[in-house]
């Protein structure tokens, strides 16, 4: 039996012993003696008698251990042509002072703080400063519109907001301050203060409740880390639900630190002193786990990149960053590689840079098509490793465990379940399916450390949405199968969440925006395949009777409304006006059927359809793109 199989078996059969062993890699103020707390199923908790501080583990212990001069964070901004490297000592000192500044504004253990910032080092400093105080951060992606920000403010009820004056895109500057101000006109909760990082590209005019970052830091005194219970929340990260208010995924402090530390070694084969680059955004879970926390927890150097794969300035941007930073590995989404491949199909830009330190390319966030995998492998000459996880899980469910036992790559597969994740493929009745049969991907409870213990202030919704479909299992919402070798193939979402360039977005929320237009009687939004972004949202709208409006005008208004309400991240550009939508006799729109037709499948007509003739009218529209 190989290293992977023995480790996986131990993680399932001797769960407590396995994770208490893993917990020894962390410095605890109170070392846990218990692994799993199963006193309140299905709400399981990890390390219930442990206490720690995540920021201490990410910074202070490395300084105390004699590695204070090692680079901790390399910031590379292609959009401002700026760079900055922070040593572990410098980053620790900045975080300790900013935490002191937050404390002077009344932030205490357990308080929530919303962070609305682009890819600047101050975003990581703000996250770690919250962790140092035992406060709970909730980072909101800087591309989200006022309505999305407002919903998160009302759910998290933050003591204060930390923002930047702007984000910088290749062709424009996105001002954040007007978005924050507009969001606060929509909320019932009003945070006391807003700390604003002024960026040279576009400083913001500040009202009375604003305080400049530099002003706060000028008088700030450093504070020591505050120990918290392992089961206390470290952060809340909101994810797209299919309906209703946003879901606040909770990450607890102890399980998070243990699981991320384990993953860096077992999954990514990255260790103290290595340079690691995750090309994502701190507003997403990948940025939380693998830009901010995991690399610092193990004493690696984390690269933080503000820019794009192409256009800042060219398709060689990623290879320049790898060459200049000495990154051993890159973790990004397939969308980024598809964008580079489209502009530089022959890989000429790759040849311009010294990539001798580069060992592995990791991909996740959406399906990695075999064509993109093959192109990257052939042009870069390194293993290209697909893996799969979710906002909810916080770290990989299935991967090629490079630090345990590197396995053969099978294009289209995320390889095998990571130790701790007991993955099953279930039929609609909950029976386990044999190899080769596709079904719902579920995970046997309890979930391992680092995954969500619940949703913010909503145990009931957590149980209803994730744990109620199959008794004793967490439902991932993805479908797939395993082959005879145990490799997992993830085939896509089984709900109405789509994946645009690695970003999970709710089609239901987009439909709500379209339906609000006075000319629209009903609508549907589906995800359709896109060569560059993986999926794109496609809108279908039926007009109200008697409405007289120019179709192009309506299209422009609907696209603008989605951009305004959801944000540019929705990449919503495609909407058709149609005579009707296919429905069941009970009135449910047949979105799965629409998706199948749009993807060119010979979709069977459901027996429950009310009017099969509607599909005949829609086929040419759906297949025209």
Regions found by a protein language model. Name each.
Residues 55, 73-128, 145-150, 209-215, ...:
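Conserved AMP-binding/adenylate-forming core of the ANL superfamily
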Residues 69-71, 194-197, 207-238, 245, ...:
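Conserved pre-ATP/AMP-binding loop-to-beta segment of ANL
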Residues 128, 132-215, 326, 333-334:
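Structural core segment of the AMP-binding/adenylate-forming
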Residues 140-165, 180, 323, 330, ...:
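AMP-binding/adenylate-forming catalytic core of the ANL superfamily
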Residues 192, 196-198, 532, 564-589, ...:
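AMP-binding/adenylate-forming catalytic domain of the ANL superfamily
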Residues 257-275, 285-329, 342-348:
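Conserved AMP-binding/adenylation subdomain of ANL enzymes
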Residues 300, 328-331, 341-408, 422, ...:
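Gly/Ser/Thr-rich phosphate-binding loop
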Residues 416-420, 431-466, 505, 602-603:
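Conserved ATP/PPi-binding loop(s) of AMP-dependent carboxylate-activating enzymes
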